[in-house]
């Protein structure tokens, strides 16, 4: 996961209920429970699907997504920090920066085809300045949406973590333009002090065919 937990004026307690539960169940991060809730609530990820996980370190989302797609599917996880390798051959990880100029080309080297879901848990390193953190969060989410628009197959799904702020509605409308249905979800595993929510886009609209001259 990119960045660090936002400071909302309350002590940061990493060893909470979900932290302990993740440890007991062999999950790499408490965030695994967030994506588990999302894919159970919405029909986004199925056996055989190809899924892109952005901001994937340390791998909690990847563990849940790997179980969801199974060995006939594929999960690609990227982050700016290394992710401990997975034993399943259908889970691939890479150290990449989504904001780098060569990101799209490097992602295509990993997988040239379309994705059934683009899921982003990316978050910026927070500054403590609310407006700045919101803008940085939307920049990352916006890049994820660009990828979903360019690489998501018709009917595919999209998930992005964002910090709610002034431009939240504008970004939600951008998702609505691409997907038939958009949901705003705050998973139960989200820390009480966090300002994050997840925007979920369901059923990617088929791109319109260019008009004939």
Swiss-Prot record:
GO terms for cellular component: cytoplasm. It catalyses: uridine(2552) in 23S rRNA + S-adenosyl-L-methionine = 2'-O-methyluridine(2552) in 23S rRNA + S-adenosyl-L-homocysteine + H(+). It is found in: Cytoplasm. GO terms for molecular function: rRNA (uridine-2'-O-)-methyltransferase activity. CDD domains: AdoMet_MTases. The keyword Endoplasmic reticulum does not apply. The active site is at 161 (proton acceptor). It holds the Pfam family FtsJ. The keyword Methyltransferase applies. Its main location: cytoplasm. InterPro entries: RNA_methyltr_RlmE, RNA_MeTrfase_FtsJ_dom, rRNA-MeTfrase_E, SAM-dependent_MTases_sf. It is an enzyme of class 2 (transferase). S-adenosyl-L-methionine binds at residues 59, 61, 79, 97, 121. Specifically methylates the uridine in position 2552 of 23S rRNA at the 2'-O position of the ribose in the fully assembled 50S ribosomal subunit. PANTHER family: PRE-RRNA 2'-O-RIBOSE RNA METHYLTRANSFERASE FTSJ3, RIBOSOMAL RNA METHYLTRANSFERASE. HAMAP family: RNA_methyltr_E (MF_01547). This is Ribosomal RNA large subunit methyltransferase E. The gene is rlmE.
């Amino acid at each position: 996961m990119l960045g660090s937990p936002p400071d909302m004026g309350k002590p940061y307690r990493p060893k909470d209920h979900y932290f302990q539960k993740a440890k007991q169940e062999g999950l790499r991060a408490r965030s695994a429970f967030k994506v588990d809730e999302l894919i159970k609530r919405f029909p986004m990820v199925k056996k055989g699907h190809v899924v892109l996980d952005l901001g994937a370190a340390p791998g909690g989302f990847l563990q849940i997504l790997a179980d969801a797609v199974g060995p006939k599917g594929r999960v690609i996880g990227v982050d700016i920090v290394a992710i401990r390798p997975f034993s399943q051959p259908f889970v691939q990880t890479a150290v990449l920066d989504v904001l780098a100029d060569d990101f799209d080309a490097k992602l295509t080297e990993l997988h040239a085809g379309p994705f059934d879901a683009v899921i982003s848990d990316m978050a910026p390193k927070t500054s403590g300045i609310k407006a700045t953190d919101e803008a940085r969060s939307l920049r990352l989410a916006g890049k994820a949406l660009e990828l979903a628009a360019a690489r998501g197959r018709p009917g595919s799904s999209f998930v992005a973590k964002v910090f709610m702020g002034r431009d939240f509605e504008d970004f939600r409308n951008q998702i609505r333009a691409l997907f038939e249905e958009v949901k705003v979800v705050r998973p139960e595993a989200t820390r009480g002090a966090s300002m994050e929510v997840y925007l979920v886009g369901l059923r990617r609209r088929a791109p319109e065919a260019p008009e004939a001259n």
